[in-house]
Structure formats: structure tokens, C-alpha cells
């Protein structure tokens, strides 16, 4: 018998979601890569696997695999999908869940309008926690590229590593070419997600994100959180920021640098299917 899956998305950042509570699922890197192919597989940005947890206080394990098969520690858009998936398929009757990823714990709250708020934890700036190879923590870092040019960027971890660049216009930003160079830069030993941020006003930014292992996606929840945190810390934006991505808007709330940062946005079901091989 094949493995049942559900296709979901958060603002167009698309996933297959697998129930590992009621099914035994062991996918290899090669299998995930084949399934992610949009011509010969299903096609998705990430594969999400929800599993039972044996740890007190944790409702589920939440595993995230990029399209290249790499398991990563954070996906905010996926977390919203996981919350609605768990309730819809009867894995829980709760509206507030705690899930454990490879790197962090996340609190998920299903709101009355079926949007989901995700506690993304306290952002981390220390180079060793990102990780980034740097002698000391700095508001901004300079990276030398293969072509001899240098680029200035901010670096932060929100459960996964992010670089954030301030640009004048995201429509003309070299997201794919420069994003790829930065993502694979040796100063980021685990690769890095790269956000191109345009500040619109005190409460709004526009953003495009090159995701490690995926390329540019039309929405990235953790990227929105990372960019909003950088905007608040270094550009004096509000404690409530609307992040406009190609796929739609996310709301980020961060009352102070020592508090957890909260991501709120939608999630949607698309279809169900069965993996035959």
C-alpha cells in the first residue's frame, strides 16, 4: 500500500504533508528529490512529516525536508500547515500545539479565522548560533564573492540561518544569481536562506527570499520573521510589521529583542493523494 499525503500551501509556499503518526514513513534523500520534481513527481518546496512525540509537553515531532532532501530546522509557513493538518485529520482536538523540529520547539495557535500564529522563539545574532564564520558579532557583515565583489548583509537565526540584504527595489533585486552565491558561501557552513528586503514604511516591508535547497519561493515564513527582526533591530521599524511577499502578506509581532517573535498567516489544503512508489 502506498503512503497517503496531503498537498498544502502557505501563501504559495507549497508542501506535501505526511502523517507519520498513523503510517510508517522512511524516505531517502533521493526519494524526496524525485517527489519534489514538478515535472515527474508531485512538486513542492518542502516535504513535511508529522510524527508522534514521546517527550512530555511536546505534541508532535515536526520534520522538514527541503526539495534537495536536506532536513532543516525551521519552516514557519509549514508550521501553520502542520497545525491545521493535525486538527483536520483528527491527530489532535487542541487549538494550541507544541511541536519539536530538528533544532527548536514551536508553539502553534489556531485562531478563530483559521489563521495560525507561530511562536518562532527569540532570534539569535551570535555568529556561532547562526552559524556564520566570523570573528565577532556585528550588525552587518561583508562577504567577498567569487567574482571579487563584496556584499554587505545582516545575519540572524530564527531556528534556521538567514542573511538579509537591504535593497531599494525587490523587483529588480538579483535574487536568484546573488542569492545562490550567498546561500552557498563558505562563511555559512550550513548554507543560508537569503532575504532581499525593501522598507516601505515604519510598519511594512517587501521581501523576496532565496531558500537554501529550493531557490526562490513565493513566500518564506522564517524569512519574513528574519527580515522583520532585522528591520526592527537596525532600522527602527514598529513592533508589528506586515511583510509583503510575492505570495501574500504575513504579520510579524515582536515586542522587544528578548521576547519570542510571532508569525501569523494563513494555510490552505489543496488535495490528497497516494505515493505509489
From Swiss-Prot:
Gene Ontology terms for molecular function: diaminopimelate epimerase activity
Keywords: Amino-acid biosynthesis, Cytoplasm, Isomerase, Lysine biosynthesis
Sites annotated Important for dimerization: 271
One annotated Gene Ontology cellular component of this protein: cytosol
Site (Could be important to modulate the pK values of the two catalytic cysteine residues): 162, 211
Pathway per the UniProt entry: Amino-acid biosynthesis; L-lysine biosynthesis via DAP pathway; DL-2,6-diaminopimelate from LL-2,6-diaminopimelate: step 1/1
GO biological process, alphabetically ordered: lysine biosynthetic process via diaminopimelate
Name listed for the protein in its UniProt record: Diaminopimelate epimerase
Family listed: Belongs to the diaminopimelate epimerase family.
Keyword Amino-acid biosynthesis (UniProt): yes
Residues of the active site: 75, 220
SUPFAM superfamilies: Diaminopimelate epimerase-like
Binding site for substrate: 13, 46, 66, 76-77, 160, 193, 211-212, 221-222
Catalytic activity entry: (2S,6S)-2,6-diaminopimelate = meso-2,6-diaminopimelate
Compartment list: Cytoplasm
Function field: Catalyzes the stereoinversion of LL-2,6-diaminopimelate (L,L-DAP) to meso-diaminopimelate (meso-DAP), a precursor of L-lysine and an essential component of the bacterial peptidoglycan.
Record lineage: Bacteria, Pseudomonadati, Pseudomonadota, Gammaproteobacteria, Legionellales
Designated gene of the protein: dapF
Amino acid at each position: 500500500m502506498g503512503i497517503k499525503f496531503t498537498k498544502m500551501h502557505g501563501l504559495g509556499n507549497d508542501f506535501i504533508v505526511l502523517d507519520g503518526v498513523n503510517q510508517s514513513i522512511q524516505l531517502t534523500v533521493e526519494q524526496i528529490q524525485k517527489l519534489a520534481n514538478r515535472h515527474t513527481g508531485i512538486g513542492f518546496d518542502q516535504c513535511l512529516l508529522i510524527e508522534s512525540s514521546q517527550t512530555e509537553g511536546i505534541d508532535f515531532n515536526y520534520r522538514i525536508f527541503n526539495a534537495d532532501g536536506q532536513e532543516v530546522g525551521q519552516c514557519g509557513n509549514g508550521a501553520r500547515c502542520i497545525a491545521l493538518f493535525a486538527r483536520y485529520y483528527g491527530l489532535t482536538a487542541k487549538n494550541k500545539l507544541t511541536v519539536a523540529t530538528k533544532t527548536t520547539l514551536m508553539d502553534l495557535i489556531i485562531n478563530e479565522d483559521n489563521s495560525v500564529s507561530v511562536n518562532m522563539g527569540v532570534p539569535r545574532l551570535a555568529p556561532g548560533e547562526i552559524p556564520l564564520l566570523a570573528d565577532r558579532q556585528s550588525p552587518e557583515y561583508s562577504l567577498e564573492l567569487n567574482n571579487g565583489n563584496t556584499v554587505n548583509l545582516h545575519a540572524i537565526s530564527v531556528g534556521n540561518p538567514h542573511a538579509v540584504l537591504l535593497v531599494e527595489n525587490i523587483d529588480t533585486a538579483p535574487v536568484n544569481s546573488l542569492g545562490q552565491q550567498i546561500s552557498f558561501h563558505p562563511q555559512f557552513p550550513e548554507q543560508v536562506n537569503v532575504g532581499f528586503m525593501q522598507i516601505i514604511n515604519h510598519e511594512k516591508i517587501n521581501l523576496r527570499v532565496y531558500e537554501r535547497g529550493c531557490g526562490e519561493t513565493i513566500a518564506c515564513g522564517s524569512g519574513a520573521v528574519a527580515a522583520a527582526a532585522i528591520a526592527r533591530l537596525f532600522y527602527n521599524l514598529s513592533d508589528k510589521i506586515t511583510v509583503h511577499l510575492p505570495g501574500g502578506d504575513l504579520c510579524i509581532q515582536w515586542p522587544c529583542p528578548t521576547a519570542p517573535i510571532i508569525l501569523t498567516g494563513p494555510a490552505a489544503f489543496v488535495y490528497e493523494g497516494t505515493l505509489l512508489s
